[in-house]
Each structure stands twice: as C-alpha cells, then as structure tokens.
C-alpha cells in the first residue's frame, strides 16, 4: 500500500494464506528497510502483546423481568433483536439471570434498546472502549488496568478483554 495503511485486514491476508503466498510488508516511512514477512514457515507464536482498542462502545445488560425462567431461554430473542437492529457485538457475557453485550455505538442502538426494554429490564453504559490484549501476562494486565474504570473483564490463558470507561 502506498497510502500508509497501518492495519492489514484479515480479508487481505486470508487468500494469500490459503494459497501459501508470503506477504512482504515494508514500513511506509522507510520503504528500503527490511520490513516483515507474513508467511507459513513454522515460526512459533510471537511473545509480544498486541493491544486492540475499539472505541465508542456501549455495554447493554439485560435481565429477565420474570425470574421464574432462566435467561438462557431468551437468548434467541435477544440476538434476533440485536440482528434486526444491525448491532455489531464485540463481546458477550452471560450469567444465570443476565446477559451483557458490548456493541458499537451506532444510530441503531436507541431503537434496539427500546425494543429490548419491552421484554427485559435493560441497563446500559455509554462512552466505553473495549481493550483486547492478545499475548497478555498478569503483569501486562495489571498495567493495562491501572487508572481505568473497568465495567467488565474477561480473561483467558493469553487474551484479556476489558470494557473500560473512555477517558477524556
């Protein structure tokens, strides 16, 4: 790319990967530099953390109005509404009585929330960001959390996802 792209989309890489064609990426600021080669050559995982920020997120939490039934029976209804209103879900977390989804804050969100409120008790938080850290460690995670208001956190062996209040 001669336009200085900072991200190579997976849809660009996937066809090359499928045909085992290596991709050479040169730095925009110095095209004569060595660059990086993306290829299938048996190299192990990179031990460098990768930080991915998704800004302008909303965390929507739904709770069943009638506690006589478990929320699991309502999952299809929730996701049908989310799909109908074209919301892009970035993260999902569920419990016995609630389900929370982190979605992009688009013009479709208010109508989706209004429809969800017809069926569920709904709370939501705006002005959030989703931070995903791939290749994390406990030390990296603690540094990432420092000074932030965490609304929701998910951690697996090597990946952490934090929904945080955006800082002005």
Feature names for model-found ranges:
Residues 1-168:
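C-terminal catalytic "cap/lid" subdomain
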């Amino acid at each position: 790319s001669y336009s200085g792209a900072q991200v190579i989309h997976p849809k660009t890489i996937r066809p090359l990967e499928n045909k085992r064609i290596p991709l050479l990426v040169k730095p925009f600021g110095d095209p004569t530099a060595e660059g990086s080669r993306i290829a299938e050559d048996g190299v192990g995982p990179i031990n460098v953390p990768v930080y991915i920020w998704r800004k302008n997120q909303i965390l929507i939490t739904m709770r069943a109005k009638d506690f006589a039934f478990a929320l699991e029976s309502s999952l299809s209804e929730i996701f049908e509404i989310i799909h109908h209103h074209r919301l892009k879900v970035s993260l999902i977390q569920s419990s016995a009585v609630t389900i929370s989804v982190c979605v992009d804050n688009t013009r479709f969100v208010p109508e989706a929330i209004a429809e969800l409120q017809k069926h569920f008790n709904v709370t939501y938080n705006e002005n959030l960001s989703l931070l995903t850290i791939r290749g994390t460690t406990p030390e990296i995670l603690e540094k990432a959390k420092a000074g932030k208001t965490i609304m929701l956190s998910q951690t697996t062996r090597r990946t952490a996802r934090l929904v945080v209040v955006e800082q002005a």
